[in-house]
């Protein structure tokens, strides 16, 4: 990660860390690095945003920066992040930009770029933009007079994206009753339209954005109300998206959460059965549940683990030409259809499996036994030394012997804080908590910041 770019673009508190001034520079310098210096005099750039109140302010500044470098900007309005990624590629744009802080609270916002291929930027491209941001007054082109171009609104882009999504399934959803939670974000109008167009009977919550209520006690990070609504309305299942629509979490007919691991398993199992799963492989992160890997093994499906973060999942998928991957948190990437995590796409693919198999979501998800998980964070002096600490290794080995293959241990440094994360999965909740505490106590004793 650089000075400005994190694992998912540039983020910060809107108008404090992510200011209009910074948004202007990101538009100008990002537009130059990713579009203008390819030799295009007026490169086409698509700009979308979520429902945050700060979105319009940052959008105006960003577009001004892009136009100042000579870009022809098409404003998509409120749309999901994967919608921007798809349209950038489909419409032959040089660059796509999304203004969103995903599942973060309303005070935050972010700016992320997509190249002409629809993929997020490489580290090298981000470093090039950062180098310009740190210069006093970089000498870049400034078109004048007739060389300054208008920007245009292309709000029809959302409909084009939804039509594409609809074309990826071969069935309609007549007879399915589905509750949709739009997190008061980008999918608030997109999801009901898409599922309604596919003839599902839909109920909605979290689909009334007012600029301030995005992700507030709703969406994929807060599926409790969705679970209540599914049971109350006797629906077949529910789907919760996050603020920018790149994540999804499901709820079965009994109000039980079905997470990203289970969704990947259900879709992967169907793809494998139909010989559509490239190299019989699903890419996940080290945080996926042990039950996920055991269920895949029983189906004859291979798995490949990456570091935590959907960008690492996508990198591995591209490297190995794999077409399904994702995270427990609900970022699911289906590379046959889009270049990034796509909640709406995943949702209709999941609904398609439910419709075609005639099985309930609880029945499909129940094929994967989730192991109870316990996570303890320990504040430490040097998080990176945990992997070489002899005492920590010793207690981990001891616990592994005691678990006898019915569990998993993951001890890793946090990517953003001075913490070591101790995660243990075991046969019972009690075992998971006991083993995690056992390891965390040693980490605290030998490396703890607060000891």
From Swiss-Prot:
* PTM comment text: Activated by phosphorylation.
- Record Pfam families: PGM_PMM_I, PGM_PMM_II, PGM_PMM_III, PGM_PMM_IV
Q: What are its E.C. numbers? A: 5.4.2.10
Molecular function, one GO term: phosphoglucosamine mutase activity
Q: Which reaction does it catalyse?
A: alpha-D-glucosamine 1-phosphate = D-glucosamine 6-phosphate
Q: Which family does it belong to?
A: Belongs to the phosphohexose mutase family.
Stated name of the protein: Phosphoglucosamine mutase
Query: What organism does the UniProt record list as the source?
Result: Staphylococcus aureus (strain JH9)
Q: What is the lineage of its organism?
A: Bacteria, Bacillati, Bacillota, Bacilli, Bacillales
